[in-house]
Amino acid sequence: TTESLDMVIKGMNWEQGDEAVYAQQDYGAMQMMFEQVSKRYGTVNRIVSVPNHPSSDEEIVSLYQNAITSKTKLLMVCHMINITGQILPIKKICQMAHDKGVQVMVDGAHCVGHFQFSIDDLGCDYYGSSLHKWLAVPLGTGMLYVNDKHIDSLWPIFAEHHKEPG
């Protein structure tokens, strides 16, 4: 999950003053990648704190909505928070963020194979997951979903080599 989501964060075309939104409860390595991007490009990280016992989905959606500004480029949200096991209202968060022109990247490290859902139904732009946790595949196996409309705008962080035939 970390490597796949790092590819998105590092692959975006960041400019000074761009903003990212994420939560205190997000995985530490993801927070550190946003810190690296901030140091390198002068971006701003807006950090929210998800309550352990929210009164409704709307409380969580509002939390993220209130952190978004006209400079917000990417919102990262955990599908399931690893500390508490909370499953967040991803579809509602994506709809809200998209209404504001913000892309959404979902950390789904604990979800694929744990419970049933459809990435298409969530409406996110990016979804990364660790597959070894619930699918009994080798440690380190993961996946990254990128919505078709964003593929061409992500910079590859690994070079590839194509040798011409002949």
Predicted feature locations:
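Conserved beta-loop-alpha segment that forms the PLP phosphate-binding cup at the N-terminus of a helix
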Residues: 1-16, 28-31
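Structural detector of well-ordered beta-strand residues that form the stable sheet scaffold
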Residues: 21, 46, 105-107, 128, ...
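Gly/Ser-rich phosphate-binding catalytic loop and adjacent alpha/beta segment
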Residues: 23-32, 49-58
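Short beta-strand elements in bilobed, periplasmic/extracellular small-molecule ligand-binding domains
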Residues: 41-51
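Active-site phosphate-binding strand-loop segment of PLP-dependent enzymes
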Residues: 44, 55-108, 134
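Active-site PLP attachment segment
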Residues: 122-166
